């Protein structure tokens, strides 16, 4: 079992305030507003369940003003709202918790802009809350006057049957309500044991068991955040960057520089200078004697 879960309730959404155009879009010409008030949280939940199952109306939510006063707000056509309010008031009278009832045909847009009674607020509340893992199960509510009596009753209920503590609700005037979920048989057994424990510790104020919840009632009941599966955004699919493996350079051994014999260029042979024979000056001065032979005829 979870320890010390964070408890949250789903009250009637109060912000943002809608404009007149948005209100007129959600408001049919024959719409009506119905309110039934009790002085017990289990009683108002049972009253709202009867109102939803008796006619085609939409449960906007609950308005808790303190001192134990709770009001269920429904919307729908005029005839459906009148029937739902009458059935809800009759149920609250059976519990001995009815305070007042009201039907308003065709409420003005200004009324919806100020009070949290617009049917479009149901959509806002559903968007802010995720899916509960305790949905589609029976519900049991046990209300005590005083916090210790409620905690002791909740502990006894969890130990006596296979149920889960969904949440708790405080409405003022010392009234606290423990909410358990499970099968019909387990919830009935848990509530019976919890009643005995609450009377032993303090004051038992009211109890309620609802075997089957409608969707509108399911969305308006408080539930701990531990049991909620919040819608998470899908991860963005981005291409994976493939990193190329860097090649490691292999260090080569230093090779000794081989001495390569270089051919020495031979000097080109110089051209031999032919010196002309020197002629002595004396020899040059001598006349050249030409010897002529005898002429032969």
From Swiss-Prot:
The protein's role, per its UniProt record: Required for formation of the carboxysome, a polyhedral inclusion where RuBisCO (ribulose bisphosphate carboxylase, rbcL-rbcS) is sequestered. Required for recruitment of major shell protein CcmK2 to the pre-carboxysome. Suggested to be a carboxysome shell protein.
Compositionally biased spans, kind Polar residues: 18-29
Description of how the protein assembles with itself and partners: Homooligomerizes, possibly as a trimer, interacts with CcmK in the carboxysome.
Record bears the keyword Repeat: yes
Full protein name: Carboxysome assembly protein CcmO
Organism: Synechocystis sp. (strain ATCC 27184 / PCC 6803 / Kazusa)
Compartment list: Carboxysome
Region (Disordered): 1-29
Listed GO MF terms: structural constituent of carboxysome shell
Any one cellular-component term (Gene Ontology): carboxysome
Family: Belongs to the bacterial microcompartments protein family.
Database matches in InterPro entries: Bact_microcomp_CS, BMC_dom, BMC_shell, CcmK-like_sf, CcmK/CsoS1_BMC
Upper classification of the organism: Bacteria, Bacillati, Cyanobacteriota, Cyanophyceae, Synechococcales
Record-linked CDD domains: BMC_CcmK
SUPFAM superfamilies per record: CcmK-like (SSF143414)
Cleavable signal peptide: none
Matches recorded under PROSITE patterns: BMC_1, BMC_2
Record's comment describing the protein's domains: Has 2 BMC domains, is thought to trimerize giving a hexamer that may interact with CcmK proteins in the carboxysome shell.
Example of a GO biological process term: carbon fixation
Keywords noted in UniProt: Bacterial microcompartment, Carbon dioxide fixation, Carboxysome, Photosynthesis, Repeat
Principal location class: other
BMC domain sequence ranges: 32-116, 138-222
